[in-house]
Structure formats: structure tokens, C-alpha cells
Amino acid sequence: MYNGVLLLHKPVGMTSHDCVMKIRKLLKTKKVGHTGTLDPEVSGVLPICVGRATKIVEYLTEKSKTYDAEVTLGCSTETEDQTGEVTEKKPVLAPPDEQTVQSVLRSLEGTIEQVPPMYSAVKVGGKKLYEYARAGIEVERPKRTITIHHIELTSEIRHEGDKARFRFVVTCSKGTYVRTLAVTIGEKLGYPAHMSNLVRTASGPFTLDECLTFEDVEGLIADGTLSEKLVPIERALDHLPKWIISDTLAKKVENGAVLETPGSFSHLTSEDRIAVFTEAGRCTAVYYPHPTKTGLLKPAKVLVQKSEQ
């Protein structure tokens, strides 16, 4: 049985769900789930939780993401990326200089509001926005607050015919639409624009150079060494506060017991989570402050069973 996080280099042309289904077939298990959707035309880091690690999916989806994106100035599309029909054109006679572009990018750093694109899976009135879009209906979309941690120009600005292109790297919070960001960048530069290429280079602490292709996965399965390449749950939860417990407490944890909050964690809020480790270094559960009983911690996820201790 495989347990851990498989860092997949998602190829262009597959949905995230397609990737999960293929991994299920390759590993011969239904216990597989991804940690954040990538559109079919986007490649890059797609962490896939396998086996017992499917219990920690929600703690990985919250992490920031890093993307390498290309913006094309001179035309916008209905999908805000290279796959959609062109909706507006404006020839780029003289492209903006690097200083101007960098200034626009820097103006987006911090907390900003973003309206999700019509071609997205965000739900409004019980339906996904892309369902309205495909029916030719445009609906009002609620603004979302996102955080741009860092954004930077990474290429020269290329003037190609009546268009201009450049690349940038952005590290942003969960829920950020980089194609909408590309449109916003274009607006600030005075042109209709769209995102013409996107690669996710990092998801939380996981980077592209750690990822496996499907071909890699198949080879490792054949060699019997795939388990060695899976990220252990312990590393995957490294961003959470760590509580090392005694073997006596570990017995209670495996039974899902409510525990007293140690003094070092008395400052926690209801949103915080703690990774509980045994003295041997194994992560056995994730706990959080009890919603109604002050001074107590309650299990959010128990990651081991008695038979596994």
C-alpha cells in the first residue's frame, strides 16, 4: 500500500481529475486525491495525496503557489487565456519598457481584490461559472480577496507584429487566478491582454524539480521503488506547529481522545492546526482548539489506526 504525497509534473492537455484517475489505475488504489486544480492547458507541480495521505489534502491546498506566466498584450479573450475566442484587439505599436512593466507588477503586491473569470469553477447560485458562460449568460461574480506575495518581470519584452509578450513569476495565495492577473496587468498598461502560457513551479514547499512525470511513475512502479519517492506525511505537514507527545498520550490519540492544551499552544486560534508526532518521529494526527471547551484540543484528523502503531 502506498502512503504519501506524489509530486506529479502535470502535463498540458490533462485535467487534474484526469491525473488522479490515471494515478489510481497505476497504483491500483482508489485512495488518491489532488491538492489544487490546474487547468488543462497549464503544466507543473500537482501534489497528489495517496493512501493515508488523502486525509491531509485540505492542509496542503491552503499553501501559497508560485507560477511562471506569460502575458500577451494586444488582444483579450473570453477565457482570459490562449484557449478562448478573441474579444478585443488593440495593436501594440510601441511596447512598454521594462521599468514601466515592473512598476505595474509591483503595484499588485499585497492584498488585492479579484473577480473570478466567467470560465472558472467558482459557484454562483449553485452553478459553476463556466456553465453560465457556455450558455452565453454573464452573471455578477463576487469579488475575492487574494494576496500577491511577490511578482517580478523575468524576461525581456518582445514586440511581435501588433502584439507584445513578456513573462513574470508570481507567488500568490490560494484562489488566485493568474489569467485574471494577466488581464489586470494589461489594463494597467493600457492594452487588452490575456495569459498565453502558465507553469506552476511550486505548490507550498514542493517545487518542479522534485516532480515526477507519468513515465517516471511507471518506471518506479516497475522497479518497486515508487514508495521511496513519495513525500512522507511528516514532511508534507512540516508547515504546521509540531507537538511531540509521549507514548502514553499516543495511545489516546489513536483513539481520537480530546487532550489538554499544553502551555506552549495556549495562544492558538480556532483556525490553527497542530501536527501531533510520536517520540519516534511519526505524525499520528492533526488537532485543533476545541470549539466549545476552553483549554482542550480536539482531533481534526487521526492519521494512524491501532494496528499501525
UniProtKB/Swiss-Prot annotation:
CDD domains per UniProt: PseudoU_synth_EcTruB
Catalytic activity: uridine(55) in tRNA = pseudouridine(55) in tRNA
GO molecular function per UniProt: RNA binding; tRNA pseudouridine(55) synthase activity
EC number annotated for this UniProt entry: 5.4.99.25
Pfam family, one: TruB_C_2
Gene3D superfamilies registered for this protein in UniProt: Pseudouridine synthase
UniProt keyword annotations, A-Z: Isomerase, tRNA processing
Active site positions: D39
GO biological process, one term: mRNA pseudouridine synthesis
SUPFAM superfamilies: Pseudouridine synthase (SSF55120)
Annotated HAMAP family: TruB_bact
Function as written in the Swiss-Prot or TrEMBL entry: Responsible for synthesis of pseudouridine from uracil-55 in the psi GC loop of transfer RNAs.
Entry similarity comment: Belongs to the pseudouridine synthase TruB family. Type 1 subfamily.
Descriptive protein name: tRNA pseudouridine synthase B
